[in-house]
From Swiss-Prot:
Allows the formation of correctly charged Gln-tRNA(Gln) through the transamidation of misacylated Glu-tRNA(Gln) in organisms which lack glutaminyl-tRNA synthetase. The reaction takes place in the presence of glutamine and ATP through an activated gamma-phospho-Glu-tRNA(Gln). Gene3D superfamilies: Amidase signature (AS) domain. It catalyses: L-glutamyl-tRNA(Gln) + L-glutamine + ATP + H2O = L-glutaminyl-tRNA(Gln) + L-glutamate + ADP + phosphate + H(+). Belongs to the amidase family. GatA subfamily. This is Glutamyl-tRNA(Gln) amidotransferase subunit A.
Amino acid sequence: MTELNKLSVADSLKGLKNKEFTSKELVNAHIKQIEKHKNLNAYVTETFDLALKQAEEADQSYAKNHSRTLEGIPFAAKDLFCTKGIRTTACSNILREFIPNYESGVTQNIFNKGGVMLGKTNMDEFAMGSANITSCFGNVISPWKALDDGADLVPGGSSGGSAAAVSGFMATAALGSDTGGSVRQPASFTGLVGFKPTYGRCSRYGMVSFASSLDQAGIFTRSVLDSSIMLEAMIGFDERDSTSIKMEVPQLQPAIGSSIKGMKIGVPLSLGEGGIIEPDIMKMWHSTIELLKDAGAEIIDISLPHTKYGVAVYYVIAPAEASSNLSRYDGVRYGLRVEKENMSLDEMYEITRSSGFGDEVKRRIMIGTYVLSSSFMDAYYLKAQKVRRLVADDFNNAFAKVDAILLPSAPTEAFRIGEKQNDPTITYLNDLFTIPASLAGLPCVSVPAGLSNRGLPLGMQVIGKQLDEYNVLRVASAIEAGVKHIKFEPVGF
C-alpha cells in the first residue's frame, strides 16, 4: 500500500470512505513527514493539536456516514490567510506575533467542508518575491535537487513553503496566493499542479493584502483531479469581499479526463524569441503542443503583443497598491511597535516600519510611493493602468478565436538559493509568463509537463477565459495524461 502521506486528495477520500484507514492515521503520517524534513523550513507554525482534534471529528463523521466533501483531508495554508486564534505573520517581523480574531473566507470554506489544517507555511514577506528568500523566518529549501550538483534550490515564490510542503509529501494540498505568479511559478519549480482561479472566484476576506486588484487565492496539489476537488471547496461568494463574484460554485471534477477533441488552443510562440526561455523549456513547449495535437486539439498561432510590457506594468501597479495597503502597519493598532523614550509619533512610525519591514518590502513601498506621487502619477501609474487594459484586450482578442492559451509557467528551471539574490530584477523576470494573466484576472494553471536535463520539473501554463476554470482543467488534464510516464517526485521523499 502507498504510504499514507503520499496519497492524493482523491485517493485519501476514497480510503477514508472505505474505512481503509482513519483521518487520524493520515494526519499522523503527515506529522511524521513534517518532523523528518524540518530542514526545508516549509512550515512557520505547526497546528498538530488542532489537526488531530479535527481528524477525530472527521473519523466520527465517517463512522456515522455523514462525511463532507473534504472530510479528514490534511492541508496547509500559506501564512497570509488569517486563522482565528492561530498566529498569522505574512512572514514579516512587523506581524511576527499577530494572532487574528477572525477566519479568512477561504480557510473557513475548507473547514466547513471538513478539511484538517496541519499548519501555516513559509512565504516571501508579504508575498513579495519569487524565490522564498525574503521571509523573516529564513529561506525555504526545495525538496528537489539537480542531478549534477545536488545544491539547495529555491522552491519558487512567494508561496514557496506551500509548494515545498506538497512536493515533499508534508501536506496533501496547500493554499497559496497568486498576485503575479506566486502559485504557478513555485508549482513549476516543484513538479506540482498550481491553480489560480479567476479574480473574484475566491474570497479575499482575511487574506493579508499585497496588491488588492491582483491578489487571488490558489491551490497546490499533486494532480489535476485534486486541484478540481480543492477548488470546488474554496470557491464561493463572500459578501465581506467587495470583489467577490456572486455565482454558484461550478462543478469542476467532470472536466478531468474529458476529451479536448476540437478544442482550439492558442500558442503565442513569438514570446519565445530572443533567447529568454531556457532550451529545455522551449523543447517542452513544443512537445506539449504535439501532445495536445495528438489528443485532438487544434493549435492556433496567436499574438499577445502587449504582454512584453507585463512585467514593467506589474512593477508599477503592484508596488503602488502595496504602498497603500502596507501603510496600515504603523505600530498603533496591531503588530510590532518599537518605542524609545521621548519619541514623537512620527519617529515611532519611522522606527517601527524600518525595523518591521525587510529590504524587498521597503523597496516596493518606496517604488509605490514614488509612482503615486503627484509629480509622477500620470507618467507611471496611470500609464501602467492603460497598458494593463491593452494586455487584457490582447487576451480578449485571442479568446475570440481560441478556447485556451498554452505557454510556459516560467522561463527557467529552479535555481540555486542565493544565485540571483543580488539583482532583484532578474528574479522579477521569472514572472514573465505568469504576470499577464494576473493583470487580466484570468484563470490559469501550471501543470508538470517535463523534466530538464538536470532532472528538475518544468511546468506548462494553461490560461482560460474569465470564469472558465472548467476548460483550463480539461486541457491541464490532457497534458497530465500525456506525461503520466514521468515521475514528478523528488528523490528521497
